[in-house]
């Protein structure tokens, strides 16, 4: 694929957002003008990432639920199974705890392969129950995500890349959290924004001083320089 810009995999929360989690409007035109495939890779459920693509005016190419679900070329790919996750959720509530998002629970309503639990809930209890069911917990800084250890953005990327006629190694990635580590390991070039956690900073090829949306824009400048 001969494009001016390399394929780009980019996180949402903490990377395209401001500190208050609202999307930095400046990033939308950058995504729209990117001369290469853009894959939005997030821990959010699929509809949120698809909506972002639609609002930005770009093709809907998405890795969601930390690699549990992907959408590309009108094809929906699943890399996880919800049965063990549902058992953890039930056991957590049976132990007297709450998932933490209220009765409507818009955080998990459209999830298919993992569970997101509020960070106000006890991590030790959640981690123990997850381990009992062969799962583990990733703290993204926004929620505790219960999922299979093998399920990640980085492990989902090769299947998405193949459908775009490129490889995972052709991609540049920008992110901010522990759930971006495997993505950084899978791509050819990686950037952690300045607000990234230590896991992401340790895995990234380049750590930027600029934070949040400013960090993404700084990464774009470096990629294009």
Swiss-Prot record:
Residues annotated to bind substrate: 153
EC number of this enzyme: 3.1.3.18
Pfam family, one: Hydrolase_3
Enzyme class of the recorded protein, top EC level: hydrolase
Keyword set, alphabetical order: Carbohydrate metabolism, Hydrolase, Magnesium, Metal-binding
UniProt-annotated catalytic positions: 11 (nucleophile)
Signal peptide, first to last residue: none
GO cellular component terms, semicolon-separated: cytosol
Listed Gene3D superfamilies: 3.90.1070.10, HAD superfamily/HAD-like
Catalysed transformations (reactions): 2-phosphoglycolate + H2O = glycolate + phosphate
Family annotation (InterPro entries): HAD-like_sf, HAD-SF_hydro_IIB, HAD_sf, PGPase
Record: residues binding Mg(2+): 11, 13, 176, 180
GO molecular function, one term: phosphoglycolate phosphatase activity
Cofactor(s) of this protein: Mg(2+)
Source species, domain of life: Archaea
Family: Belongs to the archaeal SPP-like hydrolase family.
Protein's job: Catalyzes the dephosphorylation of 2-phosphoglycolate.
Protein name, entry field: Phosphoglycolate phosphatase
Source organism of the structure: Halobacterium salinarum (strain ATCC 700922 / JCM 11081 / NRC-1) (Halobacterium halobium)
